Amino acid sequence: MIEEIEKNQPWTSPNPSMDEQGWPHFSEHSLFEAAVGESAREHQVSREMAMMCALGAIATACQGLVDVEMPTGHRVPTSLMLLTIAESGERKTVTQNYFFEAITNLNDVAHRTNEAALLQQKVDHQLWITQKKHLERAFNKCATQGDEAATHAALEAVAEHLRAEPQPVRSGKFLYEDTTPQALVHMLYENIPHGCLLTSEASSIFSGKALGELDKLNTLWDGGSVKVDRISRDSFVLQNARLTLSLMAQPNVINRFMSKRGEEARGTGFLARFLVVKPRTMAGHRTNQKLSKLSRKKAFNTRIQELLTSESSSERQVLQFSEQAKDFWFMCNQYLEKQMQENGLYYYLKDHASKLLENTSRLAATMHTFERKNNSDIEIDIFTLKFCWSFTQNCSKHFIEHLANEPQIITDTNLLAHFLLKIAYKLDIHSPDPETETNRKSDPFRIKARPVQPGDLIIGVETTFTLSQVKQSGPSVLRGRANSERLYSAIDLLTKLGHVKRERSRFRFRESILLSTGEPELKNGQIITIKELPLFCEQEFVQENNSNCYTSGYRIKII
């Protein structure tokens, strides 16, 4: 994806490396990468789940310190809304505890301090009530005696005493578990206005009764003011608050919510603000091993504590992007705009696509703040932005798969790939046969014999086709002139994935990637997934070997 966006650009800035599942790596010696690697290795959890927990902790620590100015000049908060969908047994709580240790400890200290302060406030308030009664009796006595001067003085004493009423102590608590949006807003108002909703079972947020209150969470994500009108208690306005959501939920909770209220939640824009990950399952694939000293955990949480306890001014620091990062940001923006057009990946997901680059910018700002060595460094570099763009694009893929209906272009491309594979398998041969070859010359879907392959690798089937042939006998939704644009878009996507190549008036299709050098513009399984075809990570590039008649190109791994 980065290669496609940067095509024909003059700079040669490094791109983040990817793991086997297509998730990006940050800088090798960064606190983030070290802690994520240690957590994934020691707890035997997926890297993507470890990254989501780490980013939740980082956003919680940074949201009160910095905002980010996007290249358009628009200033936005750095709060994040993160959702990890994982089954029971995937060690969600263990992973959360690893990255949120410092946050939990600071929150516990704040809670204990507040309890002691509340106890003292109750004593002070009771003494205040006693003194108030004494002053009121003195006032009544003066008023009864008709001493105007004494009455006025007693009244002033009562008024001054009322103004000095001991108020409830504002708590430093900022970490909240499963609760409703209404209660959350109230606690942010009564406590410090920077908080994190952390839960491994987000049932309250994804319950039907909370749906009418989700607009409050939208407003907090936007950085706006939340107005709360109440009859039984004083109304209030929550201003300049920041809230990060680091939620984990089981698939059945999300599926139930989506089936009952998903369309409404999409309509409010609530789901579009989330970065979503459904980690690969690790339960049943773990080995017995003893935990190490977890030294990376200590370094990570020490940095989190530094950020949360640092002196902050009333004005948040505003981060900006470097010039190269700005150029890359605008190219990402153009890519998203193009994909929101008809037949684009995000044509039916404009709500989600419109938030992707802002989420990328927020993520880049928090990563920069967490890793920087000097607080005066306010410029986000292009590598950090590229890492965050790769991460949010992977999250986008998970959003499409688990919180949204499949885009039309993905459905069409799967249908076309299925159709072509069916033809190719029907015509497939493993060695040249003159008689068969003669008969196949009259077949419109021609296929070449497969060459010799290295062990444990296959090239897959291939065939050729023309537009008119697919329009006549292909999938019904891609037939005819009326559906030409949909067919062209599906072919274009297969071309970018490397499975289709134009050869004059015909197109060549192969089950494996057709390229003999380099990588495709898009990698199957990264950002988008065409389930009919092997994933990019399920293929291997083979160098030419004349002694064994191997030709350079991609082969499918035999699992």
Walk through the language-model features, giving the residues of each.
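Phosphate-handling catalytic cores of nucleic-acid transaction enzymes
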Residues: M1-I559
